[in-house]
């Protein structure tokens, strides 16, 4: 052929009505080289494709003319006489086979050899073809005319499968007796055609084998073509049975009697059984389905054109003969016929998938289609059998009925749906067994624009459910179901645990110093002003066992901290200074311990001082109800001196003895539960909380819930700053992984998974928000006027508080709010933990507030923003100084006081050790200046690490009085060597000036 090529996509434009899928299938059948729409074809291949679709188009036109109301899924052989010329053209190639196939299908003009019984005489096949192709003509004309027309059709022999195979193989008596009921076909015409076909079938009984060969060929070629030249198997799919009409059913009834005799002869012949199944196959609509039907042996198919059939002349009863005239006109192509009902196993080679795909699309359109798999063929089975087959067919083919059946039982089974506070449309549809778009339609009717992810409240869900006959149950979420233990721990699961001892007492009475002496550490020196302002938890190993100590602040502002310490402890050690006696916070600590029901031990500290008076202390304690043992009471009293370590062993001995009496036990093999001792926001690690485990074991990776926050344990660190994998009962650990900074004192629960933790946390957040909204007083005219009147008379001092830890923030807030008077009111606009940020500056500027920083410092950039916004920032490290300043400012009594003046900042870029001097910080002055006589602070991540003085300041090797911005210098700090690269050294000086507050 010529070298010219044409693209498949260009060729497809010549056939706009042909889908790409059909075009590619035709290319495969014709053996074209192109495999996709982007491929190219030779001119010869293109001509073959055009001829193929031209024949198909003509066949479709003829079929649609005779049955306009029927939709055919595959091309079929024309039953009209007009087809005869086409058939004759194709006949030469297929004629050798044609004769046998034609005989096989006297009534069902099925070309495939499998469906056709043995038919040696070619003339017989033409008659058979005519019978199918021209059923209308048969009705109007005598049987003779019908026969002659059949002869013409036979020559067309499109249906004929492989000609070679049919001749070689002896045709079995099996004749495709496809009694395709056509409404138009009259029983008489069908009977005449069937008789003639039967006679011919007898003559061709020897060609039974050909039928089988044709069947195989048909399986191999799923598509039914208009007998392309050189095609050995009929490619036309048979669809005759699908379009049944009432007339066809009548014909079936009349054919039943004749069919029985025909079947009997077949049984004698032995070939009949195979022929019978083939006849049934005729109904097969799709090429893929054809193989399936052929496979299934339909013993009752006796209607085949086989010799034995001829005697029965029952062909007429089966309307299959005239089939062509009916909607099954195209059906005459016997190709599909070989396939039995869907019941038969489909041949692997059959292209059922393609057929099914087409039929599904057409069915979805709700249009009338020809069902080739329908079970009752005229004269083939009795009415009951056909009805049963039809029912099965409907189930297989009807996608819509099946889906409705699947939904209905679900509706009937559940008439209630469960809804919490809200439910998504998708979840509601799932519970009701409906599609989401049905619910969305109802919502649109109610004026609600919703999507499948839209959440509906309980009332809306009730309205929607009522539209579908459902009731709504409110399924409230109760966290107690998950957090409250359902079973009491068995005695054998309980194991001894260390006691938790809280040290309480008045400020500066030596609580932390006593703990330092026990731990052999030096915590006090690192505390601002030498007082404790955080609650600390420490795990100590002593000669008498392990003890966990909680060190609480003694300042009056830390009432809430002391109360928390008493709640989570087993034993309270009340520290009283021998020289001071019982003070205000001592009494408060006693009340906290009694409220928590915790036993109290007394440690009389500072016994090494000359002014110590232990008897006075015992007398004052007795007045409060704490009678010492030596005075005849039951309160254990130990006399100690923290600095000289006097009496510490006796104190620990008493603690161990008391814990043994209490028999402290816990179950370590359960989900952990504990309390938040302290919480803060760390710049590098995020929200961090110190948790005291009370029962169970906390492990890395556990999901937990704490207040309105949930999280997952990312890391655990003990009181010494070392990472640990797990923590058991009575052990304090620092936990990373919170979503936010929890409130100190909150309960900490480990739950099964992160999803549950988040659900509980969200539920708590919603309830907390509802409580806040409910607590807001309703605004009335009276309350508004009274508020305005009071506002005019009262001055308000707005403050923004930033602290290093949550507990300190809480204490400062309470202490400041207590200072409010009728004339001056304190209003804390915002409080948080961590370094001062730009958003804090902007908030203070908008609310005309003063920023109070407690143990936190701003960076140089933040200072610039504050100056630009004219916001005053005050920094404090000791709470009572902060409270005193606020008091003085409120009272307007602030005479000239000392005030810090910021000098500059230097960034530590390197560190090196110098003998006899210590660690020197090689620094770069980033802002202002560093003066030799100035005070300095060492900032690490915005938090104050050290406050003191400069011991040495050098530039290169020379001492310097000051170093200005942009220069490098070496800075040595007094009594401090823990300087790290990246730290900030801030210089300041103290001056006296009038208070601006």
From Swiss-Prot:
One of its GO terms (cellular component) is cytosol. It is found in: Cytoplasm. Residues 505-512 are annotated as: G1. Residues 316-335 have a biased composition (Pro residues). Residues 45-65, 94-107, 127-147, 163-181, 197-214, 241-252, 378-388 have a biased composition (Basic and acidic residues). GTP binds at residues 505-512, 551-555, 605-608. Residues 300-309 have a biased composition (Gly residues). Residues 390-399 have a biased composition (Basic residues). Residues 530-534 are annotated as: G2. Residues 551-554 are annotated as: G3. One of its GO terms (molecular function) is GTPase activity. Gene3D superfamilies: 1.10.10.2480, P-loop containing nucleotide triphosphate hydrolases (3.40.50.300), Translation factors (2.40.30.10), Translation initiation factor IF- 2, domain 3 (3.40.50.10050). Keywords: Cytoplasm, GTP-binding, Initiation factor, Nucleotide-binding, Protein biosynthesis. Residues 605-608 are annotated as: G4. Residues 496-665 form the tr-type G domain. Residues 36-415 are annotated as: Disordered. Residues 641-643 are annotated as: G5. Residues 108-126, 151-162, 182-196 have a biased composition (Low complexity). One of the essential components for the initiation of protein synthesis. Protects formylmethionyl-tRNA from spontaneous hydrolysis and promotes its binding to the 30S ribosomal subunits. Also involved in the hydrolysis of GTP during the formation of the 70S ribosomal complex. Belongs to the TRAFAC class translation factor GTPase superfamily. Classic translation factor GTPase family. IF-2 subfamily. This is Translation initiation factor IF-2. It comes from Desulfovibrio desulfuricans (strain ATCC 27774 / DSM 6949 / MB). The lineage of its organism: Bacteria, Pseudomonadati, Thermodesulfobacteriota, Desulfovibrionia, Desulfovibrionales. The gene is infB.
